Amino acid sequence: QVAGYESFSSQEYYRLAYEIAGDIIGGEYGIHKLEDYDLVWSPSGKTCSEHLFSLQTKSGDELYGTLFSSHYCGRLNAAGNIDNSLTVGCRKHWYLLFEEKDYRVDKGVLHCWIRQNSDTSWGGGSYYPNFGKWQRMVEAKEPPFDNPKVTSGWRCDEGGSEQFFAFTTKYSQQIADQTQPRTDANYPFLRYADIVLIFAEAANELNGPTKESVDALNDVRTRSNATGKELANFTDKTSLRSAILEERAMELALEGDRRWDLIRWGIYLQAMNALGGMDEANNVKQRSSKHLLFPIPTLEILTNQGINENNPGWD
């Protein structure tokens, strides 16, 4: 039970989620489905049936172009090298949740790039991760690691720099021109995959592990070439809940869901503080109860007579 919500019935809300997600899956609100992985993040798939609500953008436009894709995917110069940003990604812990064959890391993670200056200054290139298939490809100089611009070799440092994370390709695959400061990468507020996982979670919370809930989970997994889960391996509601929570972290990474998921499950502080205060790039991750809420802007407190104090811990 999340503090402050003791009067809420989680079962009531799970029942509503189960019914509404079921209606969407059943086609009551139009035809939506889990599209082929390659289509979802392609230019032609930006308005496909999987995307229920997205922020639509326009390449190179000061008003309608978006900046977030540069942080997640980097901005390219005319030579095809990263010359700006590419600083927001997922940790190695996240990457290791996946099977190597899973499209969400095989295709959904940037595996090689060249940073202007930090790489070009020594004739090198960067890659991620430094194990498994991609490490073997680096050692064998298989494409794309046969790039003639990389004359001195490839480097990967997973433990001490914001330059080496599991950077997503979700947004770079769909944009028309990655050299633009403002791109046409659409931001997905709600995808059909989220609806299916909501249905799986709600079904489990109401009825425990059933074929219905595990099938929904597996629909998301197998679309990305991941191995399906076996119903027999889930002995109780808690075990399937953990699998669904993990799947949400995998499927919806960098789509703005994770913090809210951790808060609604009541494990935000536990999860964040398990990092030991710092992540690999020395970003402070220590959190206290005040971080469960954002601070109220000072201007709002001054102008709204109904607000006489800030949220706890933000005075």
Set out the residue ranges of the language-model regions.
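C-terminal structured "cap/appendage" subdomains that terminate the fold
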Residues: 203-206, 213-279
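Elongated scaffold/linker segments in the mid-to-C-terminal portions of large proteins
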Residues: 23, 30-196, 205, 268-315
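Helix-capping and short linker residues that terminate individual alpha-solenoid repeat units
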Residues: 28-31, 225-226
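Hydrophobic alpha-helical scaffolding
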Residues: 7-10, 14, 43, 84, ...
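Charged, low-complexity surface segments at secondary-structure and domain boundaries
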Residues: 4-5, 79-80, 92, 226-232
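Extended, hydrophobic/aromatic-rich amphipathic alpha-helical segments that build helical scaffolds
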Residues: 1-25, 53, 102, 186-220, ...
